[in-house]
Amino acid sequence: MARKLKAPNSDFELTERALAPFLDRIILGDCLEILPQMPSSCVDMVFFDPPYFLQLPPKRLIRWRVRTVVEGVNDAWDKFSSFDEYDLFLRRTLEEVRRVMKPNATIWAIGTYHNIFRIGTILQDLGFWILNDIIWVKANPMPNWLNVRFTNATETLIWAVRDKAAKNYMFDAKAAKAIDNARIALNVWRIPLCRGKERLKDEAGRKLHSTQKPEALLERVICVSSKPGDIILDPMAGTGTTGYVAKKLGRRFIMIEKVEKYVEAAVKRLEGLQICATSI
């Protein structure tokens, strides 16, 4: 006997049903193909960690004193033919990201001097309202082996709300002040790059992902700007740090990643948390 389905009685129920295939999953696919399949106004916070577009030369960088290879960011996913192509990629992605954000949702966009100014401009062009910039000071940065410029020891996070008119976005002032046990919440965070057991490696012992973010960074971001039960989106999730930390902190999450080996590593990393990878 066929079971009669109960019709949803609210927009919330409709959204919940449409969102079910995405929740608490790392989805193997291109975010520009997956995001349009998601319902509008459904996520509470976004962590946006796009390619840096470093434009590195094809030659290998060698540490001149010890003659070893520098493991920089020279992956295929970081290559674009021009600034125009890169900007179009950012704009198209952020348009879809903004659509799936709730009106009071916030986004954390991270980058280096190579791309963060372009990201900030596009965020403003699309109607996001910037709340803060956070300077992440790396306690253990990669030295500048060529001795031609200062060692780049920071990255910038732009924290923005979807709409300027939103006054009820989530900000946990107590959690913010707990950072470094400060009386006031400062926008400078000193956190080391991930290392040791936290840094995922391939079979040859090399870094699996060149820009894996430390869990401590995501813990601060998620604690300050979301509450338990909130839905966190990471459209370019890499090896799954955002979902891993979100799950530990009692949040729901949606992760998208197009590189299969990263998805496989994320699934293995999160097996104890009952995460599954799917391809839509």
Protein language model regions, located:
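Core catalytic lobe of class I
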Residues: 1-264, 275
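PRPP-dependent phosphoribosyltransferase catalytic core
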Residues: 265-280
